[in-house]
Amino acid sequence: MANNSPFRGDDVARQEHNGFGPLSELRGNTATITSAIVVVISSATLLLAVTWNEMREGIRFLVFTVAFLTLSVVLGEIVRRLCLVSEEIKHKHARYRGDWKAVLKTTFTFGNVECILGVATVSTLMLCYQLYAYREVFFRPDFAILFLLNCLVVPQLSFLVGLRQLSPVETSDLNEKENKNVADGLAWSYYFGYLRLVLPRLELRISESEYFRHKITDRKLFILLPKTCFTCDDIEQADSRVKWVGNLPESKINRGGIKERSYKHAVHEIVMPFPDGTEEKYHFIVEYATPLMSLYDMSRFTDAQLTGSERDHQVVLFIRKLTEILGKSEECKGRYELIPFSGDEDKNKIADILVALHNNANIMVDEEAEVSIPTQ
C-alpha cells in the first residue's frame, strides 16, 4: 500500500513543520558567558596596562576602584528596593495578608544571593584594607561624595528614566523559564483539562466502536496546530477532502461538579485517488488544538493586548511547552501526534499532511521489519 500512495513523508517534510517554520528552543547561557568574557578581557587588559607601566599606585587605584564601585552598586540596589517597599506597603493587606515578612521577602529576593553576598563581602574587605593601608591616598571627601552619589542618586535616576526596565528579550526569557507566558498556561490547561483525561482512554474507545475499530489503523489522536491559530468549526471547511464520518463512543467523566461530562472524538475519512483509477481510504481521529483559538481571539480583542507578532511567538511557545509536557507523560505516550503547519489552506493541505504522516509511519514500520528479519 505504501508503494502505491501518491504522497511520501519526505514530500511534506521538505517544508519545515509543514510550512509552519522553525520552532525556537529555550534560550541558553550565551549572554551570561559573553558578559563573563567581557569582564575577564577588560580586567586583564587594564591590569596588563598598569603592570606594563610599572605603576604600583595604578594597581592600588584599580583594586580600590573595583571594590569601591562594586560595593556602591550593591548598596545602591538595596536603596532602590527600599523605594519599592514604599509602594508595596499600600498593598500589604490585599497582596500579602498584612505580613511584613512577605513584603520584604518579595522585594529583597535576589536570584544569586550567595554570589551577591560573596562579592559584597570581598569588596568591603578590599575597600577597608585600602582605606586603612593607604588612607592618605584614598581617605578623601571627593571619594565619599562619589560613593554616596553611586549609592543614592545614580540608581534612582536610572530607575526613573527607565534604564532598569527589562528589555523584551529579558522579559521573554524570564517568562519562558518561569512558565509565565500565556502559551504556558494554555498548554498546561489543555493537558490537565483534556488530554490527560482522554488520551489514556483512546484505545478503549476505538475498540468499543464496531464500525471504526478495524478502519482506524493509526490509533492515536492527531492534533492540528496551525500557525495562524485560526481553527475552523469543521475541518472540512479547511480541506474538503477531510470528511467527518462519525464519532467514537464518548467518555463520561465527573469533572468540576458536572456529572458524567461527555468527551468524544470525531473520526474523519480521507479518500485519495490513484492514477490508475483506484482509491485509498484513510481514517483519522483528528482535531484542532482548541486553545489556539483563544490566542486567535485574543489577538483580535484590543483589551487582551496581544499583537499578531506576539501571537505568532506564543503559538511556538505553546507547541514547545505541549511537546515537553506530553513527552514526560507516560499515560499519554504513543497516543498522540502533534502536527504544526502553516494554516494556509492553499499551500499546506490537511489531507496531504495526514496521509504523508501515515505513509511515512508505514515506511518506517516496513524498514524496521526488514531489519528484524534474521539472515540465514
Curated annotation (Swiss-Prot):
GO biological process: activation of innate immune response; autophagosome assembly; innate immune response; positive regulation of macroautophagy; positive regulation of type I interferon production; reticulophagy
Pfam families: STING_LBD (PF15009), STING_TM (PF23417)
Topology term for the membrane: Multi-pass membrane protein
The keyword Transmembrane belongs to this UniProt entry's keyword annotation: yes
GO molecular function annotations of the record: 2',3'-cyclic GMP-AMP binding; cyclic-di-GMP binding
GO cellular component terms, semicolon-separated: autophagosome; endoplasmic reticulum membrane
InterPro entries: STING, STING_C_sf, STING_LBD, STING_TM
Transmembrane segments: 32-52, 59-79, 108-128, 143-163
Residues reported in the UniProt entry to bind 2',3'-cGAMP: 194, 255, 261
Residues binding 2',3'-cUAMP, per UniProt: 194, 255, 259, 261, 290
Alphabetic keyword roster: Immunity, Innate immunity, Membrane, Transmembrane, Transmembrane helix
Cell location: Membrane
Principal location listed in the UniProt entry: membrane
Family: Belongs to the STING family.
Role description: Facilitator of innate immune signaling that acts as a sensor of second messenger signals produced by cyclic GMP-AMP synthase-like receptors (cGLRs) and promotes the production of type I interferon. Innate immune response is triggered in response to nucleotides from viruses and bacteria delivered to the cytoplasm. Acts by binding cyclic dinucleotides: recognizes and binds cyclic UMP-AMP (2',3'-cUAMP) and 2'-3' linked cGAMP (2'-3'-cGAMP), two second messengers produced by cGLRs in response to nucleotides in the cytosol, such as double-stranded RNA (dsRNA).
Entries under PANTHER family matching the protein: STIMULATOR OF INTERFERON GENES PROTEIN (PTHR34339:SF1)
Record's protein name: Stimulator of interferon genes protein 1
Gene: STING1
